[in-house]
Amino acid sequence: MMAVPAIDTGRSVGDNAALAEEQADRVKAATAAERKRTQRRWLKALIRVVSLFVVLGIWEIGGGQLDQSLFSTPSKIIVAAVGMIASGELWQFLAPSLLVMFYGFSIAVVVGIVLGLLLARYWVIDTATGFYITFLYSTPMVALIPLIVIWAGFDTAAKTIILFLFAFFPITINTYQGVKNVSPELIEVGRAFRCSEAALWRHVVLPAALPFVVTGLRLALGRGLIGMVTADLYTAISGIGYLIVRTASTYQMDKMFVPIVTLGLLGVFLSWLLRLVEIKVAPWTRTDTRD
Amino acid sequence: MASASSDTPAVQAIQATKMFLDGAVIAYRNLNLEIRAQEILCIVGPSGCGKTTLLRSIAGLTDLSSGQLLVHGKPVKGPPDGVAMVFQHFGLLPWKTVYDNGAFGLRMNGADEATVKERVSRYLDLVGLRGFDKSFPHQLSGGMQQRVGLVRALAMNPSILLMDEPFAALDAQTRETLQEELLALMQRPEERKAMVFITHSIDEALLLADRIAIMTARPGKIDEILTSPFGWPRDLDGVQRNPQFAEMRAYIRSKLKAPTDPSKFKPATETA
Ligand SMILES: Nc1ncnc2c1ncn2[C@@H]1O[C@H](COP(=O)(O)OP(=O)(O)OP(=O)(O)O)[C@@H](O)[C@H]1O
Ligand SMILES: [Mg+2]
């Protein structure tokens, strides 16, 4: 925390030299804090690299002793990955799955946020439809897939619906919770300063709910990835799911791990992207600026 | 903002009653109070006697159960014109910068950006927050955050300033600094306004008040109103050195300790 500047009200036009000195101190403090943060970041990166080497090393040595038709090693997987990327095979199967992910997730974000806000704002809508949402959220989505196939076929449309259903609920529910959890104290501040309802939503409720919404998006991403592979496996077997099934059924263990690792990396990458967006749109939730 | 002729009381409560939970909890009952224009009224009283509720009623944030409450001579229906509030919990919006928080009240009341800029900058300077315009509340100390709360209210140029234990969450030194700043501000003729200041600190009440209202609990009502013997201008040292300071302080403390009705003493077994 910064020190309280000792400026009293009697002295409205402050002493410029003192003010400049204070400004310099502030810059100094900011630089020192930044240096400390950078050091800590590097240290953490180093620890992770070491850990990665140890785990991969154990896998490499241990994995090599096992039956290679059931198990593979990191070096073999890397070789397979390079081959699959160079030949375009990985991308060929990943692209259609990503497209489904993109469609389904986008629709889920829009519908989820809008519905969450409506449910939170209008108690009639909440009372009339809230229990369907609870019910559907509690139903394992996989159980609905045969029905979706009957209705929408085996292709992109069906897969998009499946993805939507996997991703939609956490977004709606978190948006709803975010609005319901806005501190009554802040709402009262808005009312005390005579906000209109629209202004109250814009300046108080929506920003306060934003971190919840982002958490919902993060949950939805995880579920969306599950939905993506599930859709590939349970409808027309295609995309990245097909790649896993095909390589597994032919005991190409090294090639099979490539799409699996790719999915993991994809999840990490998307969460990281979301975190960047969050810092951009909700800078007050940043925790790393504190000492 | 609202202009009321100086002889209309700023606030007038007539047999005002506020109950919660279908009448199970009485915040205050049959309360009569008059706050004159430009007067600083400090309210002290035990916890739970209805001080915050009274302030929220004046701010139009909650309805009366019965009786009348007038602000600038008009019955309160929703937040009245010319009233601004400073909260014990600061109530800053974490997603807005210091400047935007300070501008919030003005903007919500439709001020144009030129006015906003002029007034917010002026009060940010006045409370020593120059250069912090772009900081966010979480980057500030508690004392600085409450200064922003003060700027937000003052920038609206209210004719009535409501303060609910504004300095209670601060450490003793910061509290004293802010008390002195507020005192200095209220001695500027152009800044003087009616102020209702709730506090648990008798010293703070003695320092700031024209009059001090002592509230009692269950049901909350105004027990006694004392007129401050300290004239204007005044300062912390002068007030505390005045022989009447210790006397008044002892008196108020004894009032707050001893309920007027001895039957309201709780048996010792219940207090632990
Ligand atoms: N919204 C509410 N619903 C129900 N009861 C309430 C509500 N607000 C206040 N009360 C009750 O009304 C009484 C007065 O509360 P109030 O907050 O006004 O007291 P206070 O004098 O400000 O106390 P403190 O000094 O602790 O801040 C208390 O018994 C409190 O529990
Ligand atoms: Mg209170």
What is each residue range found by the language model?
Chain B
Residues F136-L140, M144:
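Conserved ABC ATPase signature
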